[in-house]
Amino acid sequence: MKVLVYGASTNPSRYAYIATELLLQHGHEVSLVGIKKGEVLGLTIQQEQPFVKDIDTVTLYVGPANQEGLLDYLKALAPRRVIFNPGTENPELERALEKAGIQTEEACTLVLLHTGQF
């Protein structure tokens, strides 16, 4: 499955980094988007909002205050679902995505992976 981690970080103690590691361990193809340049486990963090083809799932690691302009980007990517990890919940964005036919889920990517529900 092709997954985009939005809010990627090079800091190994950040949940976005841990999620990237677990996604790779579970055999997923991972793309990273973040505000700072860098690499995570050999993957380059892309800046801005690059178009990435065939994304199944976007997992968010940015809070509502940093989600401005995200709706148009997510609609352009047209993923099957967007996971709102703890602290990223945004009912307005969730409703808009669902209206656009994109499934949303308030969940923890780490828990979903560890419990086989991803």
Where are these regions (language model features)?
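General beta-strand structural signal in soluble alpha/beta enzymes
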Residues: 32, 84, 104-107
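NAD(P)-binding Rossmann-fold cofactor-contacting core
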Residues: 13, 20-41
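Anion (oxyanion) recognition and catalysis
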Residues: 24, 98-99
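N-terminal beta1-alpha1 ligand-phosphate binding loop
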Residues: 8-12
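Conserved beta-strand elements of the Class I
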Residues: 4-5
